[in-house]
């Protein structure tokens, strides 16, 4: 207890200069396939009610009374017995398939449903990797200063008597601060009719000293903005309300560019080799973003015309492609991006379907390899606002991006951690989507898995992998050098049957055919452990190199923040147990959720962060690891797992701490 | 002589704070129909040579040697006898028609030619009203500060080693002053290829702190810009060189919107009554401007991509239409334009075909009735830079726009002068185009006409009308009340045969069928004189009202500047003689040419004038005449012509003074 208290005080101190952190609580997530809509709904709400405000349409003759039997959905998560009405209206086969009536299905835990009967694998790919676990940096309402503001105005009729221009009438209404008010052409095009229609009682939509639109007065409180996380594999869109800074809706989809290459390197190759390559990739991502937008807006009952602002963050290549800028310079000497500055453009110019005057902010970057996503992460961590405390940040995706430092000095490096941490190159690895084991614990002699969407497991994602290896290390099934050992007496005997010797090498059976989603066994192979060792070794070596360069030891690290596909869900203890993180106090490790979108949302909600991001890009120092002898030595040294003599039983406690 | 000297000193004093005035001398104008190209060429140059740099193509097999007989043109101006080669290669009928060989025709006086044999009336409409008389405000080279600048740069290869972005490399090349350099998306799109192609030795095209393009180094000296005068009836485009501020080419055409109404009022009506009316008028003017641009550029051997800037000035309605902004508010209470501020937009956004990054500056206006054309005129007059001297400006077109004052206080008013001054509502009136009598003098008992294009007269334009009435007043043929009197003994007896009594009213025969272009007589009717009296009475009353309001007399006026269709060409003496101007000293009256385009060119060439124009719009005070008793009384009083006892013989001298 005492320790907890200390921690809290410490945290409060740390955050004193930052907006307070707050984890959104209450409610459960409903993931609606194939649209991959993620809805935050009240516990116990029916699926029918939850879908009322979305553009997902269910058939119905009875209007949700449970009598027509038409509002069929397929529940993919574990589900209790059917209701009497469902037994009457659905046949046996349907009930066994998980078919239920939306109006009779109440949601008490996170749930995945499909609104189409045919469950196509392709549709399953469109899965949210991030928002089933939502922790974003909370901004107290008084600190909100969104990029877009609205002012309800009644233009005095006197003002209009003497041939005053429409724009000048609005300037007068806004007061002398807006003497230099400007307006883009498309706002001016519709201004006279709109003023007439509203009889000069309306709402001015403002971006700095620029009028974007004139709306009816009832629109004054409809203030929303979007952020986009331009991930290489997954795109995430979030809708924020400016009234209280809350996240209203989240949607994500697989980045359609994946068809042209799974990673940045293969997409750069595609662009170099195809004359229209850049334009085709640009169109793919723009289409994806437009679809996300349409999901987000319909789930909140909004229209395209209601959105005047979006902020996008991604790696340098993704941001370049979105803007139609050639990223090929990033891949070749002298490794020049076209642009590192942040850019504010008309959203329509880029192809985004929002209000015609809407603006798109695209994050600044440091270089071709330090993108807007990493800067967003730094913003989210509050490191720029810390003078005295050293913060370590890890963005654990395909690359491991690391930063270490404070507002005084901030270093970054990039390690080619390899795709293992995203579940790739792992026998039964998968990205963090419904069906992926995302967490593992060992309690009372048995393994327990947390599976995304509460369905039976299909495979394992990065966070599950790290957890599992940590558990097996604790159980003594994996040794310090990474070997999966044959069953040993006295060591986790309940798991002995899961150690399978195949051609002289031991693999670990995570789920038997009976336990798995598609009746195929799920293994952790010896090779998988080796992949993980490579990945975690590179990251640990990167951290150590930065620590040396800044001249600190493990004890000097004040906070550790995790982000990225893995970083969001991994148990802090596991990262320390496998030696990915140095042996810091567990309590200083925190996941920042989807840090790219959170950083972008900070800018959306508090405009001064745009300037902070630009300064940050100038401020940070990049450390190139590839040619450093110290890094290579640390890398070899950190391939092994650290010694630790924790008893398996204590792991569960640690992991829920 | 002494007087001249005084005048010069006085002028220099007046201009001490202004760029010096300079009238372009040397060379002659060649007007090429049906393209209506106006070329300023060296005296004695052949038509063939003159057309080499244009996009007008002549047939030829001999390459201008005078042997193939294919380069036929029709000379509309007076022309001397054909050359021997022409006699051999052309037949009698052709020679009589004015057909000549371009390569054998040398131009010694302003000349109008047609490159098509069929002379269609429609093509004749495309006539320049302004530039056959070119007096623009000259800006000394050291004072040039054009809206667009270019800098030849060699980006150091060192700079490129460390992953610097393309834009940052250019920032470094430009020096610390350009730390905040921005670039529009379409510039960034092509930047990497262009940097590669030029091997980082190139030319930065800059608009303030914005990079518009990266060109090859040889483009560094190709610096040009356009101005557009958006006249209700005529559009004028001018191409300026930023190297020395000189006017490189001029083109004009009838405003195609005239098909939808001759004046502003009828176009506003068209827009109100047709849902697509605004868009169709906008397209018409944009097409016209694109055609003018293409003429201007081809005559200077330039391409669309060479032009990064255009400045447009017109009345408020014309500017609104060009921008696609509804002007209907201007016509109805509360007489609100959409916008009075000056606007800088991407030229392509408006539909102008220039470089994709090119900008269009559209002049600020004061109100629906005081447009960018009048502000341009004020800028041109230098009134804003005058603290002590009162300047009177008259823009004499369909409306008479008047300003009076100095940099301390500046009043304007608008008089519905009526269309007489533009040659409309006059029996044989026409706008100032080839065939219009634009000047009249009386020497040695005979009338002499100056006809635009040096052809036989077809009619009379505003300046000719004012001149003619002034002459007839001096001759005693028109009396103080405006009556054309029957022949009187001892009064201009050489003209007696021209006074024709028709149904009890006297008309004046300006040109007999033999003297006229199309064998039809050209008259000045009694009714025409009445129209002129109405127009000049309104203007004179407007001037007097402003003088009263500012509290000055005629002797306090330091300079009088004339602009507009009429103001450009009218003889100052005539304006005083008919009482349009108060009886100021003749030497202080000066025509400022096409003041709308000159004001726009000041902004193009010296960017601080953009700010000046904005301040001017705020500064000027408008005096509404329609409800003022004093104006109405002055109007009635000034319908008559002033008494004066000048002898006819002295008129010629006065007019050439
Ligand atoms: S809507 Fe009719 S049963 Fe659900
Ligand atoms: S070009 Fe052959 S005669 Fe003129």
Predicted regions and their residues:
Chain A
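Helical "lid/coupling" subdomains associated with nucleotide-phosphate turnover
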Residues: 262-302, 306-309, 318-395, 401-657
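Short acidic-glycine loop/turn motifs at beta-strand connectors
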Residues: 34-35, 76-78, 107-109, 241-244, ...
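Catalytic cores of nucleotide-enabled group-transfer and carboxylate-activating enzymes in metabolic
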Residues: 27, 50-52, 248, 260-264
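Local cysteine-cluster metal-coordination motifs and their immediate loop/turn environment
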Residues: 57-79, 92-109
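Short, contiguous acidic and Ser/Thr-rich linear segments
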Residues: 35-45
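Nucleotide/phosphate-binding catalytic cleft detector across ATP-hydrolyzing
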Residues: 2-20, 25-28, 89-227, 232, ...
């Amino acid at each position: 207890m005492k320790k907890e208290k200390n921690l809290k005080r410490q945290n409060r101190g740390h955050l004193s200069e930052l907006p307070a952190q707050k984890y959104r609580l209450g409610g459960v997530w409903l993931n609606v396939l194939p649209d991959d809509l993620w809805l935050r709904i009240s516990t116990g709400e029916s699926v029918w009610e939850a879908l009322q405000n979305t553009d997902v349409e269910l058939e119905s003759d009875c209007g949700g009374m449970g009598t027509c039997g038409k509002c069929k959905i397929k529940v993919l998560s574990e589900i209790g017995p059917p209701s009497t009405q469902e037994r009457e209206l659905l046949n046996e086969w349907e009930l066994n398939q998980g078919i239920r009536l939306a109006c009779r299905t109440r949601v008490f835990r996170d749930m995945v449903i499909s609104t189409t009967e045919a469950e196509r694998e392709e549709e399953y790919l469109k899965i949210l990797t991030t928002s089933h676990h939502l922790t974003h940096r909370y901004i107290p309402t008084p600190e909100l200063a969104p990029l877009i503001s609205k002012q309800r105005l009644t233009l005095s009729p006197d003002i209009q008597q003497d041939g005053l221009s429409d724009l000048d009438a609005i300037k007068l209404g806004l007061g002398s601060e807006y003497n230099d008010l400007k307006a883009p052409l498309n706002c001016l095009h519709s201004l006279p009719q709109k003023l007439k229609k509203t009889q000069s009682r309306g709402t001015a939509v403002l971006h700095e000293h620029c009028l974007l639109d004139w709306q009816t007065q009832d629109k004054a409180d409809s203030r929303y903005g979007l952020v986009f996380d331009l991930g290489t594999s997954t795109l995430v869109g979030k809708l924020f309300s400016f009234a209280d800074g809350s996240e209203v809706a989240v949607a994500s989809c697989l980045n359609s560019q994946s068809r042209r290459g799974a990673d940045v390197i293969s997409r750069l190759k595609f662009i170099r080799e195809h004359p229209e390559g850049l334009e085709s990739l640009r169109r793919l991502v723009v289409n994806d973003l437009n679809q996300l937008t349409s999901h987000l807006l319909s789930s909140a009952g909004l229209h395209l015309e209601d959105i005047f602002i979006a902020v996008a963050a991604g790696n340098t290549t993704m941001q370049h492609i979105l803007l139609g800028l050639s990223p090929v310079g990033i891949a070749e000497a002298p490794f020049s991006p076209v642009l590192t500055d942040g850019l504010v453009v008309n959203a329509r110019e880029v192809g985004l379907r929002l209000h015609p005057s809407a603006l798109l902010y695209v994050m600044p970057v440091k270089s071709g390899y330090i993108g807007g996503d990493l800067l967003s992460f730094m913003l989210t961590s509050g490191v720029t606002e810390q003078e005295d405390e050293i913060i370590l940040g890890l963005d654990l995706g395909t690359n491991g991006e690391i930063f270490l430092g404070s507002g005084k000095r901030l270093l970054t490096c990039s390690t080619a951690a390899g795709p293992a941490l995203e579940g790739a190159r792992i026998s039964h690895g998968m990205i963090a989507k419904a069906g992926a084991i995302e967490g593992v614990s060992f309690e009372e002699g048995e393994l327990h898995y947390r599976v995304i969407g509460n369905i039976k497991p299909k495979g394992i994602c990065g966070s599950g992998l790290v957890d599992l290896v940590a558990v097996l290390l604790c159980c003594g099934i994996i040794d310090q050098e990474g070997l999966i050992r044959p069953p040993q007496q006295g060591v986790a005997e309940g798991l002995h049957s899961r150690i399978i010797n195949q051609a002289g090498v031991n693999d670990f059976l995570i789920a038997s055919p009976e336990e798995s989603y598609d009746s195929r066994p799920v293994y952790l192979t010896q090779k998988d452990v080796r992949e993980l060792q490579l990945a975690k070794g590179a990251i640990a070596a990167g951290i150590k190199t930065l620590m040396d360069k800044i001249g600190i030891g493990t004890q000097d690290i004040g906070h550790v923040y995790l982000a990225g596909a893995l970083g969001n869900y991994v148990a802090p203890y596991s990262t320390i147990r496998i030696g990915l993180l140095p042996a810091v106090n567990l309590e200083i490790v925190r996941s920042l959720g989807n840090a790219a979108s959170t950083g972008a949302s900070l800018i959306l909600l508090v405009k001064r962060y745009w300037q902070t991001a630009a300064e940050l890009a100038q401020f940070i120092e990049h450390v190139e690891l590839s040619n450093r002898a110290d890094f290579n030595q640390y890398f070899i040294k950190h391939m092994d797992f650290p010694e630790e003599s924790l008893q398996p039983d204590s792991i569960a406690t640690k992991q829920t701490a």
